[in-house]
Amino acid sequence: MRPKVGETYFGPMKRLEHLGIAVADLVEAERIFTDVLGVAPYKREEVEDEGVITSFFQTGDSKVELLESTTPDGPIARHIDKRGPGLHHVAFLVEDLEGEIARLEGEGYRVISGPKDGADDKRIAFLHPSDTAKVLVELCAEKRG
């Protein structure tokens, strides 16, 4: 079901989970965002499979994720080389990751990565930005049991 403009529709995307920001220097970015947001990061975590160290800030119901590459050829390093530091992805929380992937693939959207384990106790998948108005969209769900 595709809602019309002006209609209220509480669909499968539960909320904006976080904004992912690619940074060249995690320590400096943490200092800046601690000043700007008025809170310290609640978690720093390395995701070896992705070649990245993440740092999370809680901002109300949503989060900010800072991402620094641990390898010169990792996805975040390539992103910074091509586009510079800044917004990397927008993540939406879903209840059923595999179900949402199936629904979106059925509508012609391409998954370029996942489903797989990600940071902050989540299972994640990414949609191809060519299909999503040039925005890298992450779907994430809480890891189950």
Language-model regions, residue ranges each:
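Short loop/beta submotifs within extracellular cysteine-rich repeat domains
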Residues: 29, 39-40, 64, 72-75, ...
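Vicinal oxygen chelate
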Residues: 5-10, 55-58, 65, 92, ...
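Regulatory and interaction patches adjacent to catalytic/ligand-binding sites
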Residues: 79-80
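N-terminal beta-strand motif that seeds the catalytic metal site of vicinal oxygen chelate
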Residues: 7-30, 85-94, 142-145
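Amphipathic alpha-helical segments
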Residues: 25-40, 104-107
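Acidic (E/D-rich), amphipathic helical modules within compact regulatory domains
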Residues: 40-60
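Short secondary-structure junctions
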Residues: 38-46, 108-115
